[in-house]
Amino acid sequence: MNTFLIDYQQIQSPAKGFSKLFVDYASEGEARQELTSNFFHYDYRHEADYYKLLGSLSSKSFAREALRDLLLRQNREYGVAEEHLQLLEKIRSPRCMTIVTGQQPGLFTGPLYTIYKALSAVVIAERQKAMFPDYDFLPIFWIESDDHDFEESACTSLFRGSTRQEIILEPWNRLPGQMVSRSPIGPSIRQCLDTLVESLHESDYREDIITKLNEFYREETTLDGGFARTMAWLFRDYPLFFLSPGDPAFKKLSVEVFFRELSTCPEASHTVIAQSSRLEEKGYSAQAKPRTVNLFYINDHNQRQKIEQVDRDFFALSPGKQRYSRHQILEMCGDHPERFSPNVILRAIVQDHVLPVFAYIGGPGEISYLAQYRRTYEHFGLKMPFIIPRGSFTLIEPVVSRIMDKVMQKSGRPSLSRKHMYQTAFHDMAALQKNAIKGGDNHDYDALFDRTAEALARELLALRPALVQLDPTLEQSLMGTSKQAEKALDTLRQKTQRANRRKHDELLGQIDKSAMHLFPGGVPQERVVNIFYYLNKYGPGLIDELAMVLRAHSTESHIALEL
């Protein structure tokens, strides 16, 4: 497998690239230094920070016995191998830290970046163990089971021939705002599985994939349950553990954060707003929008209701008419912490309060909004862990590699490399198409017409002195003739471009096909395509290959990987 590192600054996909904040965070130079020192507590590039964080986490108290019991119970249910489950005993020791990543549950695991997050957590845990052999680092995948965005969780897509096949799970007996973890998938999962089966070509691996997904996704299964079991199966050879924070046992461990939020709101939101203003002053965009109360209340129908602060000491649930005093809602939280759920602002705070988190592995969007939380962490008496970018890949199939070779040949520039072609494709696919047309017959028609237009304008202008001397009224005719000539030449240019495009339609069609594979729907492949398209073609060993590539490279560059 050939790998090519692409700088995030070079990636400008048709619909959406990467945020300025993330690009700066993954780069070198003063902008990054200013960003990390002002908006994060630790910098994973600074060796001294590792010892500070190890000392801080080792001396801090966590409910480690309860964590061991919770993780053991959940991961045994998800099907994690017993040999890996034994490693969970290590979390009882103050010298054991966690490397955390996470995502809301996705249908059949959702987009590729979910897999890349999990692999990144495993590989970075390995690196930390190699650096600090006296400590242990457990990779944990946080499954956002409290999430209520069913539409985002219930869809995925695969390539099917020359098109992209979307698979969408229809909601079944769902109420608005209902958490994805609290309701069965329902009968439409059958149609989803059938569509998946039809989309997978015959291969040596197809039958095993179909069998397992039929086992993990049944009508009575929840989305997070199917997701966890599928991920545990895919990563069965790795000591990766899963955590569902919707578990009542986990909510008990989170209650201190809930209490502080309800007791001091809206102070936490003010910290986010203040930090967001500083970000915007530096030219960055604020991603996360805080609420007055950054908690939801879970009602009897498993719907997440917003908690609104009506005035200083009274709260209301929305939608609904229930009103509670601050004392009442604190009492409710103490008696039933499982009824409360953090929003995007408090999720990271809860995570780092309950778990001894050494590093969080985040995607571009997550890193952007985590930059808003430094003061919020301090409000809850915490410091942020290392925030490390996840691995980022574009998987390039042989057919796309061959198309790139054709473009290189057509360009008339034998010195070009595949890396250059990929860099051009990731930066500006239209430029790649234009270069292919230009190089196809060694004629740069744009330059040819530009030279002709300049020469024609020059020659017509040379007529002016003689014509004006003969008859001043001829100057107006000359100007009209110049405009007509310019218009006629432009019309001829457009006809030439269309003729040239027709001549190269086959190659341009192939470039369009490669664009569909690299940027389906105009966004990076990793945000759209499902892993099972590739596992069906290239086998389960692909997971190991991706892990090997991650071990060999930093996660601060995008990796174009030829399969």
From Swiss-Prot:
InterPro entries, alphabetized: Bacillithiol_biosynth_BshC, CC_BshC, Rossmann-like_BshC
Keywords (A to Z) from UniProt: Coiled coil, Ligase
Record keyword Ligase present: yes
EC number(s) stated in the UniProt entry for this protein: 6.-.-.-
Record bears the keyword Glycoprotein: no
One of the record's GO molecular function terms: ligase activity
Family: Belongs to the BshC family.
Protein name, per record: Putative cysteine ligase BshC
